Amino acid sequence: MPLRLEPEIAAAIDSQIWEIYRHRLGGSELRQLAKLFKRSGLLTRLENILSPTLRPPSRGYREDLEIRLAWIDKRPLAKLETNPRRVELGDAAIFFFDLFQNAKTKRYLQSRAVILQAKAAKEKKQLARPAVPVNPTIPRAMSSTARELELLSTWRKFDLYKASGSRAPTVRGISVAPPRFPPANGWYMATPKSRPRGAEIHAWKSPWMCAPAASGLLCNVTLGNLILAFLTSSMVNGGGSSLPEVGTNFKFDPQYLSMPRGNDWDRLCIEILRLCPRNRLPQSLFGARAGVAVVASVLRSLPYIGSEDGLGDWFLRFRDFIWPRRMAVLLIAVTRTEG
């Protein structure tokens, strides 16, 4: 079931995100993501904010919160049926699990996920009014930015590849089939490439401003509001009915990790989890010993220029070997234990 959180939680999350960046903005999306998910970053702060919202333990009942961060070493890629060139699935993902258990049963009340595409606003107009796809405002046809937007805004059928060097897809013909558009499955998150000045400051109520995956939509949802809407399965605060929910539920059982099935949104979520290091997954759900992910102080990025053959593919493999483009996966689990 969704968490029951007050609207003020969003402001508390945004306040802590500002503290992570020490109220200084500017830098590439990968560098800014590294700051967000550093050892003293969002993970610990989110746990401190959410833990007090759990129901106090009573005789025969308790609630526990576990938050983990996993880094997928090389980002998975999608190859749309309508496009011969692969595209990275996203820069980050958030998962939420709600587990009920007692002496006789273990039942997953809810499993939910959202994929996030991070972009650094560089153009003057984007610094003042960031809008999807952020950088650039109008991408070249067949560019990586154009392909990212096509994937997250349409979710046409695609083949999923484990990494850029993978010759064969992990899953063929994945069909997410969102019921409405813009889809709830994937959102954009924007951060300023350079420090906002003057009137530009008003656009950045949070270091990360978010929007659904639809061309031209303003990034006017703070990351705190996005996380709140995701965890509560509700509309974004002040977003109105025009915005979709953040994320979509999926069917989950730990046995699916060893025996995946299907080719829909459920399968895509399971495949992302399968790529996560086992010891980074919530121990309460997966039984693995959870560890702390260490983020490199400097993450370098080169644009995706690959194709299905020749120099582009070789370049991708070389780039990923030297500067692996990792995908951050934030996992939030609530366990409700009776008895």
Where are these regions (language model features)?
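Short, well-ordered loop/turn elements at secondary-structure boundaries
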Residues: 88-89, 109-111
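Acidic-basic catalytic patches of nuclease active cores, encompassing PD-(D/E)XK
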Residues: 4-77, 81-85
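Conserved catalytic cores of phosphodiester-cleaving nucleases, focusing on short active-site segments
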Residues: 92, 114-120
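Mobile, glycine-rich extracellular loop/lid and propeptide segments
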Residues: 2-5, 70, 87-90, 95-98
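Short loop/turn motifs that connect adjacent beta-strands in outer-membrane beta-barrel proteins
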Residues: 102-107
